[in-house]
Amino acid sequence: MSKVSNGGGDSKNTLYCSFCGKSQHEVRKLIAGPTVFICDECVELCMDIIREENKSSMVKSREGVPTPQEIMAVLDDYVIGQKDAKRVLSVAVHNHYKRLAHQSKNSDIELAKSNILLVGPTGCGKTYLAQTLARIIDVPFIMADATTLTEAGYVGEDVENIILKLLQAADYNVERAQRGIVYIDEVDKISRKSDNPSITRDVSGEGVQQALLKIMEGTVASVPPQGGRKHPQQEFLQVDTTNILFICGGAFASLDRIISARGEKTSIGFGATVKSVDERRIGEVFKELEPEDLLKFGLIPEFVGRLPVIATLEDLDVDALVQILTEPKNALVKQYQRLFDMENVELVFHDDALRAIANKVVEHKTGARGLRSIMEKILLDTMFELPTLEGVREVVISGDVVDGSARPLYIYAERQDEKGNVSA
């Protein structure tokens, strides 16, 4: 309990800290609570104790950092194929959070952060991989579109708004946000517009790369709580981006030609066999990616340097797309079967139907994200009619249905009339 003195002095009533006993004249600040007081020195001491407790609990939670094999196993449940990319990501994410867990240990060696670049054609699973990783580690996750970003002061979205979104995803818990994952999509669209510096400022290309450098490497970002542009009268939240893991992704159209051109220069001579770009799959070409190819594509050296871990993804063939339709825990076929099950109807896909769907996606070059739109188109009429039809117990989709030359087959349950006769 705080003490109050009625003795002499400058003041008739002297207040004392309830914890250390110092008077209000011996400390800078005395904070009042219901019948108690606490001085600024005790507040600082409490903060130090809490910080040390947080650090020690992070070190003790070593088991909380999944191993690369554990991360890979979960990725395998949701993402089909892309074995090499999943191995690279599993190791990189494990090392990143292991580094954070051991930060409080005294060491002369400072472990640098390794941000990740995902390179692969449209619809091969780049975004989905990043989302799944965030779920495994249980950290705040946000996606940003690089094409909407501009330098501060120009029309468009500020780079620091990315940090604001991450803070919102963490329910404004700054400590949690500082351990989150940011996925920046379409970074290939912010490449330098030309090799020659121009008088006109490139605010959505090289300018955005420059703006991203600081937050990717580590800086204390001043974030306006309500978003939007900064105002002098506004109070800012301070977020340290040093421990935020940045994963950048892009399709990098035409990068395969840059890689192949470099390969052709080193494959000249008797007996050298050089396949043209058209003879090789894009994913196969991407495996030969070197940082110099990204520089030629239009990324600036400093930006490439902030992305030391590069994972390349392959374009999906028909077999992989059929697997994506049926095998993952949340496979599209399983999702639609669940929807039909709500109507007490079984949805059946023939093998030739699944391959026909996959072939359409390969033909349109939309990747895995094109599967849902094709499924919706095939099942639209059935989903429209089904709630008003009585007695349907099964709907069968064949290859002809996918091609548009037939309608889905409806199989009705057998019904008995009053005399016991069975009718279809």
From Swiss-Prot:
Output a single Gene Ontology CC term carried by this record: HslUV protease complex
- Which residues does the annotation say bind Zn(2+)? 17, 20, 39, 42
Task: Quote the record's binding site residues for ATP.
Answer: 121-128
Gene Ontology molecular functions:
ATP binding; ATP hydrolysis activity; ATP-dependent protein folding chaperone; protein dimerization activity; unfolded protein binding; zinc ion binding
Q: Which domain of life is it from?
A: Bacteria
What's a Pfam family in this record? Answer: AAA_2
List the PROSITE patterns.
CLPX_ZB (PS51902)
- Outline what the protein does: ATP-dependent specificity component of the Clp protease. It directs the protease to specific substrates. Can perform chaperone functions in the absence of ClpP.
- What PANTHER family does the entry give? ATP-DEPENDENT CLP PROTEASE ATP-BINDING SUBUNIT CLPX-LIKE, MITOCHONDRIAL (PTHR48102:SF7), ATP-DEPENDENT CLP PROTEASE ATP-BINDING SUBUNIT CLPX-LIKE, MITOCHONDRIAL-RELATED (PTHR48102)
The text of the family note is: Belongs to the ClpX chaperone family.
Q: What is this protein called?
A: ATP-dependent Clp protease ATP-binding subunit ClpX
The organism of origin for this protein: Brucella canis (strain ATCC 23365 / NCTC 10854 / RM-666)
Q: What are the leading ranks of the lineage? A: Bacteria, Pseudomonadati, Pseudomonadota, Alphaproteobacteria, Hyphomicrobiales
